[in-house]
């Protein structure tokens, strides 16, 4: 079996600086507005292409069965869309991005897989040309293929490059698994009714995460603890990870030391570009 040299890729996390849910579409997705930026928290994926015609995925943590795995689904979508047959590849995933956190780890891995496949099989394709394919895998996958901080509309596939002033971010995550489907149908979800202009700067008075009310209603004790730590903590995606932004790294380090509950926490930096 002839193997090429293994190639390493990094797969970055994202946060939603705000997330407004507008309405449900006929295809089951929701129209939204959000502003994505990236974090220097990343997974590592190693791709070894070969002539085995087999797809093997391994990881340092327990992952979904192949047919339910977004990386596997990305490979199959790539095959179908670009008529690339007989793909043989071994993929080793080293996870650092927590799962079920709203940081987009699974979507990021899927996007990285599309990029690795493109690099090997169809190097003439641009990242932008793969965005419609990425959208078929999930609403968060396009931003990771795009690779730049962006304002997003539609289901997340209409992207406008929009830098965010670099900051430090303190991430905290309780041991809570969020059901995205449950949050979307919750009576506590108050959808945004007014479109806001993508030309606005970051304005927390009108930019919020519509899912925070759902989380606060479901987990009032943690929500109260969070507000006592700092009222500017925000949720990314549908949670359960919250973040606090600051240009002052020392401030965030001091706050992290005050946390006296068993929460996962990270101190990271925001990134405008990941490619």
Swiss-Prot record:
The active site is at residues 14, 140. ATP binds at residues 98-108. It catalyses: 4-CDP-2-C-methyl-D-erythritol + ATP = 4-CDP-2-C-methyl-D-erythritol 2-phosphate + ADP + H(+). GO terms for biological process: isopentenyl diphosphate biosynthetic process, methylerythritol 4-phosphate pathway; terpenoid biosynthetic process. It holds the Pfam family GHMP_kinases_C. One of its GO terms (molecular function) is ATP binding. The keyword Kinase applies. InterPro entries: GHMP_kinase_C_dom (IPR013750), GHMP_kinase_C_sf (IPR036554), GHMP_kinase_N_dom (IPR006204), IspE (IPR004424), Ribosomal_Su5_D2-typ_SF (IPR020568), Ribsml_uS5_D2-typ_fold_subgr (IPR014721). The keyword Kinase applies. Its EC number is 2.7.1.148. It is an enzyme of class 2 (transferase). Pathway: Isoprenoid biosynthesis; isopentenyl diphosphate biosynthesis via DXP pathway; isopentenyl diphosphate from 1-deoxy-D-xylulose 5-phosphate: step 3/6. Catalyzes the phosphorylation of the position 2 hydroxy group of 4-diphosphocytidyl-2C-methyl-D-erythritol. Belongs to the GHMP kinase family. IspE subfamily. This is 4-diphosphocytidyl-2-C-methyl-D-erythritol kinase. It comes from Francisella tularensis subsp. novicida (strain U112). The lineage of its organism: Bacteria, Pseudomonadati, Pseudomonadota, Gammaproteobacteria, Thiotrichales.
